[in-house]
Design a protein with these regions (language model features):
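Residue-level signal for short amphipathic helical patches enriched in basic/charged
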Residues: 65, 96, 221-224
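Walker A/P-loop-proximal flanking segment of P-loop NTPase domains
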Residues: 1-94, 103
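The catalytic "switch" region of P-loop NTPases
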Residues: 6-41, 76, 180-184, 197, ...
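Glycine-rich, histidine-containing beta strand-loop boundary motifs that form or position
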Residues: 60, 91, 150, 246-248
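P-loop NTPase nucleotide-binding core
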Residues: 70, 75-202
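Short, flexible/disordered secondary-structure transition segments
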Residues: 53, 120, 284-285
Length: 293
């Protein structure tokens, strides 16, 4: 199947029709930059690694074809059964309207398991139960939500900065009681997280494949959402059989880290989450001049 047409206008006003490549066939003739070699390199790492969770990152500049590569990657995986990998694509930029990336990621995996029909229903039910418990805990642990809830709406989430003018002695007592309850329930929260992670481990028993989650546009997503997503992967999704490929412009993403955490070593911080870094093979300058991205 041929790709769509993209019409561009040059400086002289002449319209140029560029045939957008069809990415649904994987690395076929559309692979003009010979990036299938990188595909095989990543696949071999996934296949040869133990079941422990892995996090890869693809770092390159904007416009160099990262999205094209990962979509071809996914298509290549889908057209061959012998890779023993399921690939799921997730656009962080399109989903950053959500308050917490946990829901985004967990619902993605739930849908993946549910697509296996009867075989995946039992595991899907376990995952859904875990999503509800862990998700509600995360929601309650969010200070803005918690204060809004226990104040009966007196303190709205957009007025947290003026909290000193609102809290009364009675409300202060409610806040203290809420904090005490959260402290007492910490062990239950840990159990909920452990149960959720155990349910994720069962995905591979349903699919017989490792699951690769490709997270694209991480550097373009809302900074707090993108950084929370990293934390969620590390603490909640780091289980046997799950592999992540984070797609970003590293330099830009490190600026988001510095903006949130101040004067820290952003590069070292990022390396805490990522096991292997990759970059795209350099493109031919002549092809680049012709408009290929």
């Amino acid at each position: 199947m041929r790709g769509s047409k993209n019409i561009k206008t040059g400086r002289d006003g002449m319209k140029i029709v560029i045939q957008e490549p069809d990415l649904s066939n994987g690395f076929d003739e559309a692979d003009i930059f010979n990036r299938k070699k990188l595909f095989h390199q990543i696949v071999r790492l996934i296949q040869s690694s133990p079941q422990k969770s892995l996090v890869f990152a693809l770092d390159d500049k904007w416009g160099n074809g990262k999205t094209t590569f990962v979509k071809m990657f996914q298509s290549e995986i889908e057209k061959e059964d012998n890779y023993a990998i399921d690939a799921i694509y997730f656009d962080a930029f399109e989903n950053d309207y959500q308050s917490d990336p946990f829901i985004s990621l967990s619902s993605l995996l739930y849908s993946h398991v549910e697509s296996k029909k009867t075989k995946g229903k039992k595991v899907g039910d376990k995952i859904l139960s875990g999503i509800k418990k862990v998700g509600s805990n995360l929601l309650l642990n969010g200070s803005k939500f918690a204060l809004t809830a226990i104040s009966g709406g007196i303190i709205s989430s957009n007025k947290i900065d003026g909290i000193g003018e609102v809290i009364t002695d009675s409300l202060k007592s409610d806040v203290e009681g809420f904090i005490e309850d959260r402290i007492k329930s910490i062990n239950n929260e840990k159990k909920d997280i452990n149960d959720f992670k155990e349910s994720l481990k069962e995905i591979i028993t349903v699919t017989n494949n490792k699951t690769l989650i490709i997270i694209d546009e991480l550097d373009r997503a809302r900074p707090d959402y993108a950084l929370d997503l990293l934390e969620r992967i590390k603490h909640l999704f780091s289980v046997d059989g799950l592999v992540f490929l984070l797609v970003m412009n590293r330099e830009q993403f490190e600026k988001s880290i510095s903006c949130r955490y101040g004067n820290i070593d952003s590069r070292m911080y990022l390396n805490k989450f990522i096991h292997y870094w990759f970059s795209l093979p350099k493109k031919n300058r002549i092809l680049q001049a012709c408009g290929f991205r």
